[in-house]
């Protein structure tokens, strides 16, 4: 076994392809880290990509299955974003129904998301870019009657959102920052 131990100890490799891949991964992670604090700009880019995708689908009049798949994926991600990490109904069963649904509790329970905001954005960006790339190839343009897909998606959206809202009302949590108290630092 004749290899340079200093390369393997430092995580490097003598193979230039692997070295280049590691450099690209570090550069990619660097840009992700730089983008992380800019939430509004990140979501604006996602909105722009989604608009571009919708224009592509509308103008090409095809790839409706890709659009439907992207819609289902984004709906699934959104529901994971709204859902608490720890299901309160399971905790209630474990506590032998000590805390009934709707009963007021003075115990502070922070809302921890099942899917954090950055991962939601990142997964959505990746899915949208992949969908845009798939819409460039005619092999993925499966002929389908799109109004059926649209009606099924709307029905699925309303049923899942109704269930999610009922869960939010039953266990009294608000997953969004809208309407919550904001405390500012007083400089006294």
UniProtKB/Swiss-Prot annotation:
Residues spanning the membrane: 62-82, 139-161
Membrane topology (Cytoplasmic): 1-61, 162-188
BP term (GO), one: retrograde vesicle-mediated transport, Golgi to endoplasmic reticulum
Membrane topology of this protein: Multi-pass membrane protein
Cellular component, GO annotation: COPI-coated vesicle; COPII-coated ER to Golgi transport vesicle; endoplasmic reticulum; fungal-type vacuole; Golgi membrane
Keywords: Golgi apparatus, Membrane, Transmembrane, Transmembrane helix
Disulphide bond pairs: none
Localization (cell): Golgi apparatus membrane
All ranges on the Lumenal side of the membrane: 83-138
Similarity comment: Belongs to the RER1 family.
Miscellaneous notes: Present with 2840 molecules/cell in log phase SD medium.
Job of this protein: Involved in the retrieval of endoplasmic reticulum membrane proteins from the early Golgi compartment. Required for correct localization of SEC12, SEC71 and SEC63 in the endoplasmic reticulum.
Protein name: Protein RER1
Source organism: Saccharomyces cerevisiae (strain ATCC 204508 / S288c) (Baker's yeast)
Lineage of origin: Eukaryota, Fungi, Dikarya, Ascomycota, Saccharomycotina
Gene field: RER1
